[in-house]
Amino acid sequence: MEVALYLLPVTLGDTAIEKVLPSYNREIIVNIKHFIVEDVRSARRFLKKVDADICIDELTFYPLNKHTSPEAISGYLAPLAEGHSMGVISEAGCPAVADPGADVVAIAQKRNFKVVPLVGPSSIILSVMGSGFNGQSFAFHGYLPIEPADRMRRLKELEARVYSENQTQLFIETPYRNHKMLEDILKTCRPQTKLCIAANITCEGEFIQTKTVKEWKGKLPELNKIPCIFSIYK
């Protein structure tokens, strides 16, 4: 196996590994001893799902989150400099996409280390695929402002981009606030603007549906505490 920084996708929920990850990923993972991870506990759980025989005590984990300093991240790559492959694991989906993993990849690229992204589920890409919206030009904005006035202003800005740039706009909300987000979208966006709701992607109860804002009114699904991506287009 070539020495590299491997970007290791994980499942988006309790989905069976074989449903969303190729067997090649396992071949890579079982040969790595150093992992840079967003959450140590969930990373250990994922690795045991990949191979129950993995000896967790023989592995080294380096926590990576929004509080990790650039200096610490740079130090994490010491095993790679010494010729040992490393893996990057997010809490869900693909590392380095809307994820702290991007910081370690940037440092690896700057230091000319080989970076190898592996195949796996991305809720952003899958929601675009299932929406019927423009897949050539789209933007993911993460969380919108919590303050109602700021949020509605931001929604109007994103909707304006839909019509001026023909660009799909994607964003998320903390699962327990999904319904409030939907209410704000329906109050703020034009009746003809299309809204795709993509919830529980790849998991049991997956729901991906596109309707106009007008069509959604009075017919919203129950999304409380369910991971969800919202996207709008014309």
Residue ranges, per PLM feature:
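Glycine-rich, flexible N-terminal cofactor/catalytic loop recognition
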Residues: 1-64
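Short glycine-rich anion-binding loops that position phosphate/pyrophosphate groups of nucleotides
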Residues: 12-14, 91-95, 175-176
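Short active-site oxyanion
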Residues: 29-35, 112-116, 168-169
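Acidic beta-strand-to-loop metal/phosphate-binding motif
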Residues: 36-37, 87-93, 168-173
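Conserved helicase motor
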Residues: 62-69, 144-148
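Glycine/small-residue-rich loop that forms an oxyanion/phosphate-binding "nest" at active or ligand-binding sites
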Residues: 65, 73-115
